[in-house]
């Protein structure tokens, strides 16, 4: 998302100068970005890079996007009227989590309690399909359309170390101007816009509107 460099930990100018980066700082916070849109954009950029004789490297982000490239898209019906999303938007965070635990305990335990967006999305998918995310993924047929061959590298840290690093990183980001970045975005965008509903921005927006104690901000994020 544009204007969200600190909170989304975008690569620094120095890092971006070292090699060309794609799909960074290109989307308005008011826009919704779907797995389908990502797959389409990836296919275009992948071809551009390989046509130049270079090797594309897919870095970071949500595991769902990698799954989309490997297995194709999940078959989820569209909420054409928007009624399901409207109903869920009216629920509190605790209500979302309680309802999710009842119908999809795996997603409930996998998704961080503060991640309203992913918790709500998992609940929305269940309401639209009658199936949990894990059920949909297990029934998915691999999509050979992309024909990608790649090594997969990842870091596997102890959970305690991971939590410690997250806490340190959150404090560094807050000290680096994350609150000011969010305040600037709120001058032109609603706190309910897709970008500002992501982890951290949502809690900072709540803090700025006095819905959340500033002393508990870092812990809530």
Where are these regions (language model features)?
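Phosphate/pyrophosphate-binding catalytic cores of soluble transferases and nucleic-acid-acting enzymes
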Residues: 1-221
């Amino acid at each position: 998302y544009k204007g969200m460099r600190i909170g989304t930990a975008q690569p620094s100018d120095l890092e971006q100068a070292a090699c060309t980066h794609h799909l960074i700082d290109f989307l308005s916070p008011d826009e919704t970005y779907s797995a389908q849109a990502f797959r389409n954009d990836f296919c275009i950029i992948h071809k551009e890079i390989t046509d130049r004789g270079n090797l594309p490297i897919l870095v970071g982000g949500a595991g769902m996007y990698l799954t989309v490239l490997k297995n194709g898209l999940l078959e989820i019906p569209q909420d054409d009227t928007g009624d399901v999303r409207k109903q869920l938007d009216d629920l509190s965070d605790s209500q979302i989590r309680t309802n999710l635990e009842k119908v999809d305990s795996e997603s409930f335990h996998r998704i961080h309690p503060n991640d309203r967006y992913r918790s709500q999305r998992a609940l929305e998918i269940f309401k639209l399909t009658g199936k949990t995310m894990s059920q949909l993924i297990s029934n998915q047929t691999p999509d050979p359309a992309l024909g990608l061959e790649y090594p997969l590298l990842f870091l596997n840290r102890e959970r305690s170390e991971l939590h410690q690093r997250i806490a340190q990183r959150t404090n560094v980001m807050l000290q680096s101007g994350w609150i000011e970045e969010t305040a600037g975005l709120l001058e032109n965008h609603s706190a309910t816009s897709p970008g500002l509903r992501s982890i951290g921005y949502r809690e900072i927006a709540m803090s700025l509107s006095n819905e959340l104690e500033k002393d508990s901000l870092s812990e809530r994020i």
